[in-house]
From Swiss-Prot:
One of its GO terms (biological process) is aerobic respiration. PANTHER family: NADH DEHYDROGENASE SUBUNIT 1 (PTHR11432), NADH-UBIQUINONE OXIDOREDUCTASE CHAIN 1 (PTHR11432:SF3). The lineage of its organism: Bacteria, Pseudomonadati, Pseudomonadota, Alphaproteobacteria, Rhodobacterales. Its EC number is 7.1.1.-. HAMAP family: NDH1_NuoH. The chain crosses the membrane at residues 13-33, 84-104, 115-135, 161-181, 190-210, 248-268, 278-298, 309-329. It comes from the Bacteria. This is NADH-quinone oxidoreductase subunit H. NDH-1 is composed of 14 different subunits. Subunits NuoA, H, J, K, L, M, N constitute the membrane sector of the complex. It catalyses: a quinone + NADH + 5 H(+)(in) = a quinol + NAD(+) + 4 H(+)(out). InterPro entries: NADH_UbQ_OxRdtase_su1/FPO, NADH_UbQ_OxRdtase_su1_CS. It comes from Dinoroseobacter shibae (strain DSM 16493 / NCIMB 14021 / DFL 12). One of its GO terms (cellular component) is plasma membrane.
Amino acid sequence: MADFFSTGPGIAVLIIAQCLAVLGFVMVSLLFLVYGDRKIWAAVQMRRGPNVVGAFGLLQTVADALKYVVKEVVVPAGADKPVFMLAPMTSFVLAMIAWAVIPFNDGWVLADINVAILYVFAVSSLEVYGVIMGGWASNSKYPFLGSLRSAAQMISYEVSIGLIIIGVILSTGSMNFSAIVAAQDGDFGFFSWYWLPHLPMVFLFFISALAETNRPPFDLPEAESELVAGYQVEYSSTPFLLFMAGEYIAIFLMCALITLLFFGGWLSPIPFLPDGPIWMVGKMAFFFFLFAMVKAIVPRYRYDQLMRLGWKVFLPFSLAWVVFVAFAAQFELFGGAYARWAIGG
């Protein structure tokens, strides 16, 4: 068996198996994310939420997915059908392939490349095309306005996210996620992680992630009171399901990025406890809980407030932080908190 996996076909089988394992993890997580999102929202509103299908309503997401799949796919008469059908697939596939460089433990990653951050940033930047394609191909004013809003919103907050990540790269000396986690490994456990020296950026990254993934209170591209459902107005059945799945997968990806960049990835918060993927998944679940709580509690922003926050507050502050981190890392200020080089030095 070992000889087989050293051959060309064996390596191909191994790669396919690894891809399917990551795909399976993300898809199973998706079921629990939707269920958890609905349960948290219901609890805040003093409702019960899903509670009929399966134990504690756990199979409600499966039932809803089956309902979408068996429904008829309705394409508007004036729509550009090829682009209309391609848009949700683009959104879903791009959200999935970003997971190729996300490690869950030391060595547990599909592609352990040195430019992993650039890869994720490039793929996430392309996700806006799925939304624009869906809005334009629908041949309707509400989807088109929603897609324009989404494009402006995602581009605005990608700039801030990029600058925040640059601060972490300057501290680490690497764009590899495993190296970034290794740089946070210290004798003080939880207090050795990057959340402490980069504390202001943790809050900025979290808020920018909400805007980047079109989550409340920044869900302006699909604001029901203004645009009915934004770029999703004309979609039904499986295409709508793909859009929603892509959105939740992108949210979970942001939870993974926060965990890897600032909260030690798979490292244990207590030094004498073993590290492992359970810590990684647990931290991601915690940040998704925060995403869901913000959705349930915070009212929606106006569009002008959203743009003003991104360009006049987040952008200058994150740019100033990059300069500060570069200066602190170069001269090893604050006890070398900003100069824990994983490579080079």
